[in-house]
Amino acid sequence: MAKGAVKKEKFEYEFFGPIGALGVTVLTTVVSFGSFYICNEEGCPAKFSKISHIFKKTPLFDQKSLILYLLWFSTLTLLWKCTNGKWAKGTPIDDKGTRLLYKINGFNSACLILGVVCTSIYLLGASCMEFIWDNFLQLMFAAYVFSVVLCTFCYVQSFFGKQQLAKGGTSGNILFDWFIGRSLNPRIGNFDIKCFCELRPGLILWVVFDIAFACHQYLVLGGRITDSMVLVIIFHTWYVLDSLINESAVLTTMDITTDGFGYMLSFGDLVWVPFLYSLQARYLAFHPVDLGLVKTLAILCLQFLGYYIFRGANGQKNRFRSNPNDPKLKHLKFIQTKRGTKLLTSGWWGMARHINYFGDWIMAWAWCLPAGFGSPIPYFYVAYFGVLLVHRNARDDHKCRVKYGEDWEKYCKAVKYRIIPYVY
């Protein structure tokens, strides 16, 4: 009892504890479904009378949509099992240095799925993708229900057998632990649920949605797609495929190494990413924008700049963490912590503690600008993402301050800026 009391006393809540967890759960649900009601063919933003009409006439549940989503998740699981891929070791998850194995074959799955989608469009025509347009809300509801069931399953599973628990999900409060995630690595055999959801069902579905919306625009415009839609699809597909090509890099991120798999990640991976991140493509499907050559080239340059920073920084960090003794990295300066970890203070990571976030945010602007300035709603992503990155930086900073102590203070003096060099 005494030991239990000490643990409870030392526990520090994130997101303002259970009340914050409930608030985020409700808010993200409202925003996700609200994005459909408020931004559609009736207007973006639509008038209240139109929103009310859509709300009344459009059912949330559709059996075909639920079956299709379950088939989608099952197909990707089967592809994970059946397609070739190397096995990579994750970072140590305990003091004994235990490292879990992860199958890296997400890129193969994406290529197969997108190949089937494109072949179907070529053979059957753009109209074969209209089910997604006509049942987008119902598909969102199916994904939402599935994400809640999945994170609840992982929460219950965490109480049975030998489980590595996430430190942040052991408060003892059911709501908070369910939200933040109690199990660090929920698995069925060697199938890691968290790592699988991180990069596959949501990310690949995001691209499928973009393609479906481009098909709808093609049908509406009588056989053409705007340059703005082409840009959005290229940027999103590029981001997704690049993430899957570099799938092993996710094994060193906070989502995998630190966070449990609760509602926050389950909902984020399966609902928020595909249904909210495809907002620009959905908007352009009913509000086409023709950019012209100059604007197209300017947005392309912005995307390339963001990607150069994002991928360069992440690649450098991943190589250094995987093999800090690599001769190619000997020019990099670092602080040796008392815990044995090395903190980079030069290269990309000498510019800002999260320079990769800056690159990510620049790309977010490139994804939103093709929508033009007819509505502020397509820019929701860049605003939300900026807030997310600032919050994630603060969260990471707090954890590192606790973890490294005075070494972190020394590191912050060496690398003064958080995200944007010379600004923030």
From Swiss-Prot:
EC assignment: 1.3.1.70
Functional pathway: Steroid biosynthesis; zymosterol biosynthesis; zymosterol from lanosterol: step 2/6; Steroid metabolism; ergosterol biosynthesis
Organism: Schizosaccharomyces pombe (strain 972 / ATCC 24843)
Residues that hold NADP(+) according to the record: 317, 321, 344, 349, 356-357, 396, 400-404, 411
Compartments where located: Endoplasmic reticulum membrane
Entries under Pfam families matching the protein: ERG4_ERG24
Similarity section: Belongs to the ERG4/ERG24 family.
Signal peptide: none
Encoding gene, per UniProt annotation: erg24
InterPro entries: ERG24_DHCR-like (IPR001171), Sterol_reductase_CS (IPR018083)
Record key words, sorted: Endoplasmic reticulum, Lipid biosynthesis, Lipid metabolism, Membrane, NADP, Oxidoreductase, Steroid biosynthesis, Steroid metabolism, Sterol biosynthesis, Sterol metabolism, Transmembrane, Transmembrane helix
A GO cellular component annotation in the UniProt record: endoplasmic reticulum
GO aspect biological process, one term: ergosterol biosynthetic process
Annotated protein name in UniProt: Delta(14)-sterol reductase erg24
GO MF entries: Delta14-sterol reductase activity; NADP binding
Membrane topology type: Multi-pass membrane protein
Top EC class for this record: oxidoreductase
Membrane-spanning ranges: 19-39, 112-132, 370-390
Keyword presence, Acetylation: no
Further comment found in the protein's record: In Aspergillus, the biosynthesis pathway of the sterol precursors leading to the prevalent sterol ergosterol differs from yeast. The ringsystem of lanosterol in S.cerevisiae is firstly demethylised in three enzymatic steps leading to the intermediate zymosterol and secondly a methyl group is added to zymosterol by the sterol 24-C-methyltransferase to form fecosterol. In Aspergillus, lanosterol is firstly transmethylated by the sterol 24-C-methyltransferase leading to the intermediate eburicol and secondly demethylated in three steps to form fecosterol.
Catalytic activity: 4,4-dimethyl-5alpha-cholesta-8,24-dien-3beta-ol + NADP(+) = 4,4-dimethyl-5alpha-cholesta-8,14,24-trien-3beta-ol + NADPH + H(+)
Function: Delta(14)-sterol reductase; part of the third module of ergosterol biosynthesis pathway that includes by the late steps of the pathway. Erg24 reduces the C14=C15 double bond of 4,4-dimethyl-cholesta-8,14,24-trienol to produce 4,4-dimethyl-cholesta-8,24-dienol. The third module or late pathway involves the ergosterol synthesis itself through consecutive reactions that mainly occur in the endoplasmic reticulum (ER) membrane. Firstly, the squalene synthase erg9 catalyzes the condensation of 2 farnesyl pyrophosphate moieties to form squalene, which is the precursor of all steroids.
